[in-house]
Amino acid sequence: MKKFLLLLFASALFASAAELRTIKDMDGAEVKIPAKVERIAALWHSNNQILLALGGADKIVATTDNISKNAWFLKIYPRLAQIPVLLKNNDVNLEELMSRNPDVVIVSTALAGENLAKQGFTVLKASFSDYEQMRRSIRMCGDMLGGDAPQRAKDLISNLDKNIALVSGRTANLSPDKRPRVLHIVGGSDLLKIDGKGTLIDSWIELAGGTNAITATKGPMKTITAEEIIASNPQIIIVGGDHNEDAVEKIKSSPIYSGTDAVKNGRVYGNPRGVFNWDRYGADTVLQILWAAKTIQPELFADIDIKAETKAFYKKFMNYELSDAEFGYILKGLNPEGK
């Protein structure tokens, strides 16, 4: 009887081990996840769109406040309205998260991952700060999802690489004096919050033929002084967030910006915003590369049809046919009803 129980225990352990597989997250940590992942708590805003692009949105059982408020995500993926919001203002509802019983929790910071791992959750850090890291993160998510997701990940990366190659082929040899100073403001609600060096935003600015106007500040969403902005004298200003036309007018009338070359020469632009903000860390950055290139170096990219590229991308990866009007709303940072 004792031998039988030992054999039974050993077989249970073997079966348990056989049901797990190992995957590396963005910190290089080897994480054991179920052989078939069915329930994902997507607690990094932009990763929700990556999962959608890879065909894995049906596995999301918890999302974030940022995503729940995105009217484009809801339009394209109506089930979003039924998914609990368990990350609000960067705080996780642990009790509710436990009740959702996720196979994997996706996070953006090591600290968040450590805290959740201590509570017994299986955690994958998915965040990235440049395009090479983004490729790794997309592959990781494809591997995690399984099924046809790895192939969709390859397709998404291929699309990214195609646009990078197209743009870099025309901008790589630009001399410094041909690269305008570009300031990227996170959103219209705070005109002093910018994105510095060492960010994905900095990557697409450089790729598109510009240079970051703010060189002394590193990292995303950093608050700087009005004096720093005035001293940097950006030649182009790009502002993210929704209702970007309102933000552009706010910048033009701001005493901080009125003396900059960007305002004087009419080169203040609102960044497109669709299922995720194009300028940030979602799948739409594939389109951002082209839009930024046309915006920063219009003479070099007059042949690029952003509308056609956007429609094709949304059809393939968002499974949605954009109308001409909807494309126009995305460019202006408006919702699907044009508001």
Kindly label every feature range from the protein language model:
Residues 111-119, 240-254:
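A ligand-binding cleft/hinge motif common to bilobed small-molecule-binding domains
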Residues 193-220:
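Alpha-helical, coiled-coil/dimerization segments enriched in small aliphatic residues
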